[in-house]
């Protein structure tokens, strides 16, 4: 691909990702920030496509956009939040948070200015070799991850279940 | 060809924006969304390291990170739902039960 076109697309994704993530934390209605987060996750999937990681793009779209965002939107609909208009949106010391974040960003920029990119890049990544690596060398973390997912599912059901308010020993 | 530092700058920018949002908002659900933004920034850094080192380990760590982020979203939303259902509180400044 022509490198100029590639860089133009990269700059577009940089600007749109920044604007979308600012819109997530600055929008007044909470369902609007959920939908801004949806477009943000789709742009991150496009960034994965830039990095020759097609499998990660599919996983990002299926898990995040199909699972986590649906969970967020269902939770917002269940809670029926109207208290946003009673309160102020930001905390009192939000200036301190902004200064902390900008100092962190400035430190990272100074640190990242000297990064050199190596020559040998990943030419193409097939799902076959990724699965072989996952099922041979990273097999134990994969199994532990399945247990973590199971425990999170059971714990989420138990925490969110509607419990009877007064029990018998009252 | 895009150099490596561009992707790292994108990751740093998104992580800082998520950090700022986590500090200055008081909605519990928006704080969880800012956690998702920070997870995605770190995933971009992992995938770019995987690309520029021609090594697939970074992509496997992105898989693990996505699964842990899904667990975190499930548990966090369940806790927020239990709080709203039992006390009617949605803001992090009003949770003062443990203050004594």
From Swiss-Prot, chain B:
Return the protein name. NADH-quinone oxidoreductase subunit K
Cysteines engaged in disulfide bonds, as pairs: none
E.C. number: 7.1.1.-
The reaction(s) catalysed by this protein are: a quinone + NADH + 5 H(+)(in) = a quinol + NAD(+) + 4 H(+)(out)
Which Gene Ontology cellular-component terms appear in the entry? Answer: NADH dehydrogenase complex; plasma membrane
Q: Does the keyword Calcium apply?
A: no
Task of the protein = NDH-1 shuttles electrons from NADH, via FMN and iron-sulfur (Fe-S) centers, to quinones in the respiratory chain. The immediate electron acceptor for the enzyme in this species is believed to be ubiquinone. Couples the redox reaction to proton translocation (for every two electrons transferred, four hydrogen ions are translocated across the cytoplasmic membrane), and thus conserves the redox energy in a proton gradient.
Q: How does it sit in the membrane?
A: Multi-pass membrane protein
Alphabetical keyword list? Cell inner membrane, Cell membrane, Membrane, NAD, Quinone, Translocase, Transmembrane, Transmembrane helix, Transport, Ubiquinone
Keyword Protein transport assigned: no
Return the similarity comment: Belongs to the complex I subunit 4L family.
């Amino acid at each position: 691909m022509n490198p100029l076109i590639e860089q133009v697309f990269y700059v577009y994704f940089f600007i749109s990702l920044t604007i979308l993530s600012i819109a997530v934390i600055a929008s007044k209605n909470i369902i609007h920030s959920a939908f801004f987060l949806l477009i943000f996750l789709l742009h991150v999937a496009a960034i994965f496509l830039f990095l020759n990681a097609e499998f990660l793009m599919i996983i990002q779209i299926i898990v995040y956009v199909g699972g986590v965002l649906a969970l967020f939107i269902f939770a917002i609909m269940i809670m029926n939040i109207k208290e946003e208009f009673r309160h102020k949106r930001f905390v009192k010391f939000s200036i301190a948070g902004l200064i902390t974040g900008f100092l962190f960003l400035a430190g990272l920029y100074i640190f990242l200015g000297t990064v050199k990119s190596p020559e040998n890049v990943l030419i193409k990544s097939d799902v076959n070799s990724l699965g072989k690596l996952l099922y041979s060398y990273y097999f134990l973390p994969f199994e532990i991850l399945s247990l973590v997912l199971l425990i999170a599912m059971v714990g989420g059901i138990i925490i969110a279940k509607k419990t009877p308010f007064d029990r018998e020993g009252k | 060809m895009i150099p490596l530092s561009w992707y790292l700058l994108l990751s740093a920018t998104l992580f800082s924006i998520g950090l700022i949002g986590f500090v200055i908002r008081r909605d519990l659900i928006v704080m969880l969304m800012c956690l998702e933004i920070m997870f995605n920034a770190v995933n971009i850094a992992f995938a770019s390291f995987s690309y520029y080192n021609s090594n697939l380990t970074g992509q496997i760590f992105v898989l693990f990170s996505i699964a842990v982020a899904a667990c975190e979203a499930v548990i966090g939303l369940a806790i927020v739902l239990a709080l709203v259902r039992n006390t009617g509180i949605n803001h992090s400044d009003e949770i003062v039960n443990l203050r004594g």
